[in-house]
Each structure stands twice: as C-alpha cells, then as structure tokens.
Amino acid sequence: MVKRESSTVAASTAATVAKAPAMPPPPPEPSALAIALAHLPFANGERLEYQVKYGFLGVGNATLEVLGLDSVRGAPAVHASFVVKGGIRIYRVNDSYESWFDPRSFSTLRAIQNIDEGKYDRQRDFEFFPNRTMLSENGKPETPTVADPLDEASFLFFLRSIPLEVGKTYEFARYFRPEKNPVRVIVERKDTIKVPAGKFNTIVVRPVIKTSGIFGEGGHAEIWFTDDSTRTLVQLKSSLKFGSLNLYLRNRRAGTAWDTAAASVAPAR
C-alpha cells in the first residue's frame, strides 16, 4: 500500500512538472551594427536646412542630411550629404559632398564630391578600402590613405559624435589625404545664439584642414553645435577669399529609427 501511494504521488508530481509552461527564450543580443547606430547623435532621415548668406546678403541655401542606411561592398554604410549653394556674381559656391561611412568605425567607404567655388571646379568619385588603407579616385589605380579615413561630409557627422570640451584642441590623423593631416579641431567657447530656427545654447569649434575651401587652412571657419546630445549644427561661418560665407539653421526635420535590415553586416573591405 505504501509503495502504491508513493508511485501515485510521483506520477502526479511528474504530470505537474510536465504541464508547467516553458520559459520564453532570452532576447537575442543586439548586433554590433545596432549598438553603433543606437549611439549615433543623429537618426535616419534627419534633414537640416540652412539659409546661406554672403556677408549680409541672403544668397542661397544649404542642407545637411542623413539619407539612410545603405550597403557598400557588403558593409553597412550611413549615406549622408552636405550641399551648399549660393554666392554673388563675382564669387559663387555650389558644393555637393556625398558620403557613405561605416557607423561601427566611422570610416568612409565611398564619397562623391562636386565642388564649384569661384574659379575652382572639380568632380571626384572615391572608393575607400579601410582595411587596406587604400583609396581609388575616379577609377584610377589605388593610392594610400589613412586608417579609418574621413571625407569632408563624414567629418561633420564625426564631430557630432565626439566629446567637445571648451579650451581643448583635438587632433585627428583621419582626413583621407595623408599629407593634409593632422586635422585640428579647436573648441573655442560656449555661446547662446539666435538663428531662424530659434534660440540655442551652443559649443563653438574651429576646424582647420590643410586644404582649400570652406574649412581650408587659409581661411577661418567656425561651427556652432547645440550643447546637447544631438550636437546639431545650427550655424557655420567661413571667411573665404572674397568675403564671408555663413550658414544659419532655419529648419530641422528629426530622423526616425534605423532599419538594420536595410544593410548587410559584413566587415568593411
């Protein structure tokens, strides 16, 4: 009788255990790509629109835009652009910089530049191979570049991702032309400014690149980023050969969540 009762209890216990609901599987670990995208201060589809002034004259428009998540040679790439159009009769600027950069390393993988500043006019297409520190320009044989290269457009987005401490000068050997390095970024001060888009607390930086153009060493450029986690570029002033070319934020369209399915997660080649 005791053995029969023990068997009955054991069977009942086994049945209870068998009927217990299964524990759900743990959520998958986020990928390196998802983690990198989550830490970016800008989002998919962000569009910043600017009024361009040459001195005191309103003479054009500019945009800084995140066009989406793409793929370059199997590697994920943020596609972004910086476009400036404006000027006066004796000096006009019509610049377009497109960049595809890996959000995990902030390395440029591809860049297209159409630069028209005064009498300077050039179109260049670049393919970057960060793992080999090489680049190809306009389909020509490869030449050396730097580790984790950055072009002009990706450098603007890179500046939004780093700490900016007033009084410090940061140096980076990441401009894609090795002989033009280091790029110096001088954090000058904090400032409260008013632009068409509103009033902002900002951090003012001065980038210096050993090249011609808006950020060239021969001129003087300052950038006002918002003093918050987004580091939105709200104002840019650049002294050029024929005067000052200034950008003032007039409209901001916030971005949306990234869709990691839009790009491969292969390493950059």
Regions found by a protein language model. Give the residues of each.
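Acidic, serine/threonine-rich low-complexity disordered tracts
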Residues: 1-130, 163-269
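Hydrophobic, well-structured mid-protein blocks that either form specific transmembrane helices
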Residues: 120-162
